[in-house]
Amino acid sequence: MLHQFSRNELAIGKEGLETLKNSTVAVLGVGGVGSFAAEALARSGVGRILLVDKDDVDITNVNRQLHALLSTVGQPKVDLMKARIADINPECEVIALKMFYTEETYEQFFDYGLDYVIDASDTICYKIHLMKECLKRDIPLISSMGAANKTDPTRFQIADISKTHTDPIAKVVRTKLRKEGIKKGVQVIFSDESPIVIREDVRKEVGNDEAKIRKAKMPPSSNAFVPSVAGLIMGGHVVMDLLKDIEIKRVKDK
């Protein structure tokens, strides 16, 4: 009988679908990167998805985030994504946590018995905290570095944090991890594209010079085709890692 995962089953078989159905994956940050990662998980048949994000959809999200439409501005991102996934796979258990991952909330995050974590969050100090906790708990993690201020989606690659370069966020993360005694062992996706410089005349219009948060003062540029690709790559990587023990036959070169 045909079902929404029939095309997936052609490659990974019933045992592959069952493996994904029995997996729990967390997506931390459901924005331009995380919303596409979550959708990739849902359309692959992952059976339990934890969505973590405190934000509501903002008008500036509409250019790139999967759940962001003019009609959804002001609504919680996790709730919108949960409803979207329910229309893809009603059997998928979606846990929507409208909160930020912090030192006060992280224990609640890890209470769900996670098989994998996708980190698409923005705050570097909490990214570091998450990395340390995942290493301590032996939970596989892939963390997104910078997807803003980029225009070439073909420049993404997955590597150990120790092998990253060019990406300013990756540089900060490397430095902070070294101070914690961690030099390698954290899997990330980063771009080797040099970031663009935002237009100052536009920044004056959309930024807030009185804001305490740098991102509000200096909002980064973004588009539909870079963060989405990062999210899809992360989602695909997690799915295939969960399926690492499933035999997938390939055409042999002659």
Swiss-Prot record:
User: What keywords does the record list, in alphabetical order?
Assistant: ATP-binding, Ligase, Nucleotide-binding
Example GO biological process term?
cyclic threonylcarbamoyladenosine biosynthetic process
Transmembrane segment boundaries:
none
Main EC class of this protein?
ligase
Q: Which GO terms describe its molecular function?
A: ATP binding; tRNA threonylcarbamoyladenosine dehydratase; ubiquitin-like modifier activating enzyme activity
Tell me which EC number(s) this protein carries: 6.1.-.-
Q: Which residues form a coiled coil?
A: none
Family statement = Belongs to the HesA/MoeB/ThiF family.
Task: From the Swiss-Prot or TrEMBL record, give the protein name.
Answer: tRNA threonylcarbamoyladenosine dehydratase
The task this protein performs is described as: Catalyzes the ATP-dependent dehydration of threonylcarbamoyladenosine at position 37 (t(6)A37) to form cyclic t(6)A37 (ct(6)A37) in tRNAs that read codons beginning with adenine.
